[in-house]
Amino acid sequence: ARTDWLIFVDGDCVLHPRFVEMHIKYAQSGTILAGKRVRLSAALSERVMQTGKVPCLLPYLVCPRGCSHVEEGFFLYGAQWLRRGAKHLIGSNMSLSRTDLMAINGFDENYLLPATGEDYDIEWRMQRNGCKIVSVKNLAVQYHLYHKENWTNHDENMVYCKQLQAANQIVCKNGIQKL
């Protein structure tokens, strides 16, 4: 990366037109910006892929039709009183300072299984290193396209994570640098 602020997204997500703008606007060293995402149904995902546009989600609040977390899909700039805080990170909608990430040696490459561990690991190491989670819910809006999930048994990842926490290992050994 060539910038001082890093934004993380997944390839199976569609971003609101102001997604990047909001991550940049609220960027501040010592913070991790945490957003959420709407999980679109198979039918709505197909429609989005065909048209290139996300339709108005208001009807899906009343009748979700296979969608979930629809309330996360509304851009609410200037309505802080409507937004809830973020307690945890989702790796597909987060951003942070390159300097803060380098201080903990980046992502731990020992997490080999998908789905569980990586997001939580980066969250607790960054927080232990003094960073705070700041919510960009309903600002950095993201839509997750439907696909079959490929969840595996993640017990191995969680055991590894708990070992690192018990040892208070904030700087990972198998990250950007191999220590």
Predicted regions and their residues:
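Short aromatic-enriched loop/helix-cap "lid" or pocket-rim segments at secondary-structure transitions
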Residues: 44-48, 147-148, 154-157
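The conserved acidic donor/metal-binding loop of glycosyltransferases
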Residues: 10-14
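Conserved donor NDP-sugar-binding/catalytic core segment of glycosyltransferases
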Residues: 18-58
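Short aromatic/hydrophobic "clamp" motif used to bind/position activated sugar donors
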Residues: 6
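Short, flexible, basic/aromatic active-site loop/helix in glycosyltransferases
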Residues: 53-86
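A short, conserved alpha-helix in the catalytic core of glycosyltransferases
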Residues: 88, 93-105, 112-131
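Catalytic core of nucleotide-sugar-dependent glycosyltransferases
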Residues: 116, 139-140, 153-178
